[in-house]
């Protein structure tokens, strides 16, 4: 589109395609003045990535595509397992995302049925009773005005399918 290059910034991380979650490696492409501002801001938040991470990123970019196809297939298996198991729990609603390794299910009905007063309470009790850990909505900022649903976040990038199934079996028994 005309004028888009001058006002578009593309952010890229190595987390999904190369399974480098936690390595904090990525890049930004866009107009020079915007990238300069991002660089100055970023330098004040964190120092540069360490050398071995930079070298791993270069190797990932230059390497063959086949390993990424396996990574993506495995993440899809994990996603599908988690979504399917969550949908089996009475009172949980969740959509199947296309390109992420997080889920944000709506657990409002579970929350109300169990009589919780806040989402920190449901998160802590689930961890204590089932060993399943997830983030509450508050980890991502204050709820918006009028927000009345209870959402939590599950991450599945580093968890094998058998552990997802086992954890969701325990969580389902606890929540139902």
What are these regions (language model features)?
Residues 1-176:
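PLP-dependent class I/II
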């Amino acid at each position: 589109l005309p004028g888009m290059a001058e006002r578009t910034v593309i952010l890229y991380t190595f987390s999904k395609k190369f399974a480098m979650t936690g390595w904090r490696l990525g890049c930004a492409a866009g107009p020079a003045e915007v990238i300069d501002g991002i660089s100055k801001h970023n330098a004040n938040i964190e120092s540069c990535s360490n050398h071995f991470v930079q070298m791993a990123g270069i190797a990932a970019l230059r390497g063959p595509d086949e390993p990424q196809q396996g990574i993506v297939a495995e993440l899809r298996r994990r996603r599908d397992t988690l979504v399917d198991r969550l949908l089996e729990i009475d009172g949980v609603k969740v959509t199947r995302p296309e390109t992420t390794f997080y889920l944000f299910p709506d657990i409002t009905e579970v929350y109300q049925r169990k009589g919780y007063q806040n989402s920190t309470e449901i998160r802590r009790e689930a961890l204590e009773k089932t060993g399943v850990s997830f983030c509450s909505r508050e980890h991502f900022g204050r709820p918006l005005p009028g927000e009345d649903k209870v959402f939590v976040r599950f991450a599945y990038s580093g968890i094998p399918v058998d552990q997802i199934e086992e954890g969701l079996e325990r969580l389902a028994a606890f929540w139902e």
